[in-house]
Amino acid sequence: MLLCDIGNTYLHFYQEGKVWKELPRRLKAGMEVQEVYYISVNPPSARRLLEVYPHAIDLAPHMVLDTAYKGLGVDRMAACKGIEDGVVVDAGSAITVDVMQNQVHLGGFIMPGIASFSSMLKSISPALEKELNLSVELSALPQNTRDALSYGAIKAIVMMIQNSCKNKRLFFTGGDGKYLARFFENAIHDNSIVFKGMLKTLEEMKEGKR
């Protein structure tokens, strides 16, 4: 069985505990796979997957989450189902933060990812076109422009997450998940969280719950 989480840039795959990613244009059929299931926030990339795996099944219509949130993306739903309790942070081009309690989604928010902060600052002034310093010290005020930009972007993200997690366990996934997790003592980095939610949905389908 092959699972695919189709994001804004990459197609993320999961098979027998292994996780990897591919760009749509580089996607090729691998070994013969009888079962392929996917979720997608990118229709063109989903069409590309279906060109390679025409029998792939979209799990979105079968995915259900106990929430009052209107319009919650299927990727966020899968991540929430993958943890059941705690705060899940999916740190990609955008960062989503969702709070779960006893399998109930209490709400969440979206903010720019680290790379997006850099792009926004560059659009303000050419003088702010600096590569962010991911090693910047957050406990001391910066003494140069590059560190000042880096401090402002990274500390804003970290503090937003801190204010939301309270005493809950934090789960990080996504491209910048491992980097952000190091700022939190109670953090777990797991790039299979979304796939765990997809697997749970498949279990519910087999049990006739969906």
Curated annotation (Swiss-Prot):
GO BP terms in the entry: coenzyme A biosynthetic process
Record GO cellular component, one term: cytoplasm
Entry annotation: catalytic residues: D75
Amino-acid positions noted as binding K(+) in the UniProt annotation, renumbered to this chain: D90
CDD domains linked to this entry: ASKHA_NBD_PanK-III
Entry keyword tRNA-binding: no
Record's keyword annotation contains Translocase: no
Domain of life of the native organism: Bacteria
Cofactor: NH4(+); K(+)
This protein's UniProt keywords: ATP-binding, Coenzyme A biosynthesis, Cytoplasm, Kinase, Metal-binding, Nucleotide-binding, Potassium, Transferase
Gene Ontology molecular function: any one: ATP binding
Pfam family membership, one: Pan_kinase
Main localization category: cytoplasm
Cofactor note: A monovalent cation. Ammonium or potassium.
Pathway assigned to this chain's UniProt record: Cofactor biosynthesis; coenzyme A biosynthesis; CoA from (R)-pantothenate: step 1/5
E.C. no: 2.7.1.33
Sites where the protein binds substrate: Y69, G73, V74, D75, R76, T145
Places the protein is found: Cytoplasm
Enzyme class: transferase
Binding-site residues, ATP: D5, I6, G7, N8, T9, Y10, L11, H12, S93
Transmembrane segments: none
Family designation: Belongs to the type III pantothenate kinase family.
Function recorded in the entry: Catalyzes the phosphorylation of pantothenate (Pan), the first step in CoA biosynthesis.
Quaternary structure and partners: Homodimer.
HAMAP family registered for this protein in UniProt: Pantothen_kinase_3
Protein name per UniProt: Type III pantothenate kinase
Phylogenetic placement of the source organism: Bacteria, Pseudomonadati, Campylobacterota, Epsilonproteobacteria, Campylobacterales
Name of the gene encoding the protein in the UniProt record: coaX
